[in-house]
């Protein structure tokens, strides 16, 4: 009994000492940053959906400079916005920072059967990347151009119905319908448009609108209990994962249905034609006995072999799931921000409409027509400079001890780029850094800024977003069709400036617009 009585205070003191050691980690190393609170660190400040994490980080950068640290429970995070250090992380020291910053509640990317291209690392990531990349080649995008245009025309029909009497509409809601419809048709086996009647949309929206803080908090503060909580969370959806579980089951069903269909076709002697969507493309590489390539004693090299270019059924589910979630949200947000900036900068919108009329003469818009819309490219890039989207993706885990600038970085430390500050740094972009100026992208120097690490809307280096070209194609197709017929105008419901909310991504609460029909 006396041993137990002695052990309890000893364990308690050890527990407190450990968390105090983590809490003061950056302070002891002479690195500035917000101290936060014992046990949780600065987590309470970064989990506010009403004031997104990346705006809070931007505020801290103004206080502490281009490199500082803070803790999220036991997670040690280094924030950087120095262009030279950014390039080191993503390019020059890629071998030391090839892992993502993941909350322990998300699982172990080395062991999860459904690890996807976003969370995978090492040889497994290389294999998934090598298999996925052809999906987004120009040749593949040309094949789905007709499908994307059909979804764009379907949305245009709904816009016409909703604005026939001059009503204002929330473009964010409409764009989410478009991206959900498009990704469903090119990645999920959906055969026709389900716009404004897709039962899955509310569940996907809810994933991004989930404001519950206990899930990431438990993972950050009690990492050893994270997998236990994850197990119960997936078994009992009411604990916080109901929406994700529903979406996941839908993807599993879509993949299994396609597998069954292909097997039945083989039995009946029906030849399997060219892949029609992402599921087909991934099933071409399916092999359920594929080896999961793990790193050899923690050693990873950019020149290492890709290994077996095959996917398990579970990995196919993982790829389709991440493409669905990522493709839905980010493209809809980019369209929303672009629309807002066009409405508040009518001279830019007029110039864009002139380009569309000049380059897209035929009623149908081809992939080649889209490639000629250079000014639209500038507008989208400038929009994403001022409103970077999934900045969470611009974070890495230190896999090998190294040095960034004058800071020694230990294994397991998370490094996150303050993209909002980087993208409006006057030393990089000039005195007009905070102004919407698409013409700046006509200057060849902007390409050099990208190469140096000053523009990372789609990431940088080997892990740059694989779906970037698809996102551009979707946006350009839809905007071209809308702006042929309408002009975006600020309405009485339009919030200026936009009210930004969210956690996984930073999004406008609403984007109300008046669409004036062109003569």
Curated annotation (Swiss-Prot):
GO cellular component, one term: membrane
EC category: oxidoreductase
EC number: 1.14.-.-
Main location: membrane
Topology class, membrane: Single-pass membrane protein
UniProt keyword list: Heme, Iron, Membrane, Metal-binding, Monooxygenase, Oxidoreductase, Transmembrane, Transmembrane helix
Subcellular location: Membrane
InterPro entries, A to Z: Cyt_P450 (IPR001128), Cyt_P450_CS (IPR017972), Cyt_P450_E_grp-I (IPR002401), Cyt_P450_sf (IPR036396), Insect_CytP450_Detox (IPR050476)
Organism superkingdom: Eukaryota
Residues that span the membrane, as ranges: 3-23
Function as written in the Swiss-Prot or TrEMBL entry: Cytochromes P450 are a group of heme-thiolate monooxygenases. They oxidize a variety of structurally unrelated compounds, including steroids, fatty acids, and xenobiotics.
Similarity-based family: Belongs to the cytochrome P450 family.
The protein, known as: Putative cytochrome P450 CYP13A10
Species of origin: Caenorhabditis elegans
Source taxonomy: Eukaryota, Metazoa, Ecdysozoa, Nematoda, Chromadorea
Gene name tied to this protein: cyp-13A10
């Amino acid at each position: 009994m006396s041993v137990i009585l002695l052990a309890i205070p000893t364990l308690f003191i050890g527990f407190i000492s450990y968390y105090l050691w983590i809490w003061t980690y950056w302070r002891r190393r002479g690195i500035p940053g917000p101290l936060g609170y014992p046990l949780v660190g600065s987590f309470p400040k970064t989990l506010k959906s009403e004031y997104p994490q990346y705006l809070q980080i931007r505020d801290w950068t103004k206080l502490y400079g281009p490199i500082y640290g803070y803790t999220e429970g036991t997670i040690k995070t280094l924030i950087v916005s120095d262009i030279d250090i950014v390039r080191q992380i993503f390019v020059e020291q890629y071998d030391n920072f090839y892992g993502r910053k993941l909350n322990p509640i998300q699982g172990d990317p080395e062991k999860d059967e459904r690890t996807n291209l976003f969370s995978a690392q090492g040889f497994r990531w290389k294999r998934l990347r090598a298999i996925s990349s052809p999906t987004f080649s120009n040749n593949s995008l040309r094949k789905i151009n007709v499908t994307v245009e059909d979804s764009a025309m379907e949305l245009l029909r709904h816009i016409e119905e909703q604005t026939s009497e001059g009503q204002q509409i929330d473009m964010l809601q409409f764009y989410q319908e478009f991206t959900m419809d498009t990704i469903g048709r090119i990645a999920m086996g959906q055969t026709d448009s389900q716009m404004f009647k897709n039962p899955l949309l509310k569940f996907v929206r809810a994933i991004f609108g989930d404001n519950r803080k206990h899930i990431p908090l438990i993972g950050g503060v009690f990492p050893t209990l994270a997998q236990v909580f994850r197990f119960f969370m997936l078994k009992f959806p009411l604990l916080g994962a109901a929406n994700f579980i529903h979406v996941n089951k839908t993807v599993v069903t879509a993949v299994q249905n396609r597998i069954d269909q292909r097997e039945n076709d083989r039995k009946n002697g029906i030849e399997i034609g060219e892949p029609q969507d992402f599921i087909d493309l991934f099933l071409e590489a399916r092999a359920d006995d594929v080896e999961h390539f793990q790193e050899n004693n923690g050693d990873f090299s950019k020149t290492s072999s890709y290994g077996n270019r095959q996917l398990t059924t579970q990995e196919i589910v993982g790829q389709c799931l991440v493409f669905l979630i990522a493709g839905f949200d980010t493209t809809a947000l980019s369209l929303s921000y672009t629309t807002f900036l066009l409405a508040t900068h009518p001279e830019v919108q007029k110039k864009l409409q002139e380009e569309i009329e000049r380059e897209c003469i035929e009623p149908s818009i081809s992939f080649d027509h889209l490639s000629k819309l250079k000014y639209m490219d500038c507008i989208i890039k400038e929009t994403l400079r001022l409103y970077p989207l999934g900045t969470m993706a611009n974070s890495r885990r230190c896999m090998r001890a190294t040095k960034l600038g004058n800071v020694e970085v230990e294994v397991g430390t998370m490094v996150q780029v303050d993209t909002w500050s980087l993208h409006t740094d006057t030393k990089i972009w000039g005195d007009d850094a905070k102004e919407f100026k698409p013409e700046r992208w006509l200057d060849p120097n902007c390409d050099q800024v990208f190469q140096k690490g000053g523009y990372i809307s789609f990431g940088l280096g080997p892990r740059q977003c694989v779906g970037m070209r698809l996102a551009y194609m979707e946006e350009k197709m839809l905007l071209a069709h809308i702006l042929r017929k309408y002009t975006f105008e600020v309405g009485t419901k339009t919030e200026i400036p936009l009210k930004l909310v969210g956690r996984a991504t930073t999004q406008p609460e609403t984007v109300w617009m008046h669409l004036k029909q062109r003569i």
